[in-house]
Amino acid sequence: KNIKVIEHANDLVPHYLRFICGVVDSPDVELNVSREILQKTKVVEMIKKQITKKVLAKLKEIANEMPEQYIEFWNDMGIILKAGIPEDEKQKTKILELFRCKTSKSMTNWRSLKEIKEEMVEGQDTIWQLTNVTTPEQIVALPILEGFKKRDWEVMLLTDPVDEWIVMGLNEYDNVPVKSVSQGEFDDEEEDEE
């Protein structure tokens, strides 16, 4: 009765979780005539939803309870996982909890958005990000960051090629706006006072 139907069930996991491996055993999955392709039914959608929910919950558990192991995972699969930020609006909040990045204050350690938000300084009402530079060291040397450094504002340093696309879905975290440093405008008088 139990038979292997397909090797890669792309309809059962979202693209940003394509790194997971496993077996789905269900008597309710309908097949097409060739028995090689799943029919897109409510059952398949329900299975996909449950797999996504369980995988994201397990990743959060690992991130919270075994942060060193999670960072190893992030180094290998973070570029794939963060693609879910603009792709999956329903799971975006959960994916943002798993997101890690280097920052202007932490170029060697990965930081979560939660940590960045919790450590915002007085007067900072936005989480800032900068993309499209190959290394954090290059980014920190940019003149555009001077105003942020003077204010002691942390800036997310996003160096992966896909980050330009990722930030299109990253406009807010936990009711705090996320903006590009190119949108940061500083009052000249304020800078002179410092």
Predicted regions and their residues:
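Conserved GHKL (Bergerat-fold) ATPase module
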Residues: 1-194
